Amino acid sequence: MYILGIETTGAFASVALVRDGVTVQEIHGSDRFSHLQNLMPQVEKVLKDSGSTLDDIDLIAVSAGPGSFTGIRIGVSSARALSQITGIPCVAVSSLESLALNAADTAAEETLICPMLDARRQQIYGGGYFIRDGRPVEEV
């Protein structure tokens, strides 16, 4: 299964192509908050560099926050447009849950993982997830 991942909740946009759980190609933006100008060219580059096309994609996953409100709107709108044009299913992914999933690889069962993101203005976005069967399954 090919998954096109789109992340625009932070200062830098990124796009990845994952096949059967393995990252095939990824690109990270180098210009702060330039998601609108760079996101679709990043998608094109990831597909081209991997030798893939939109016809190969089975699922589009887009980060739905928390994070930059404008970044989320750009990412979700772009992912939905791709989905509607191509008929590829699109799913929203929590930024915090994806961070917890990253940490779950090395965490013991029943470990509480608390991912946090800078919300600016001396605030944070945070969440708590217990790990079960190697996955963050319970939000606290």
Question: Model segments located where?
Answer:
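DPxDG-like acidic metal-binding loop motif
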Residues: 61-90, 95
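N-terminal beta-alpha supersecondary unit
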Residues: 1-64
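Phosphate-handling active-site elements
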Residues: 48-55, 84-93, 108
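Short, well-ordered alpha-helices that flank and scaffold nucleotide-derived cofactor binding pockets
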Residues: 41, 80, 84, 101, ...
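Glycine-rich nucleotide phosphate-binding loop and flanking beta-alpha elements
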Residues: 12, 68, 123
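Surface "functional belts" at beta-alpha junctions
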Residues: 22, 89-140
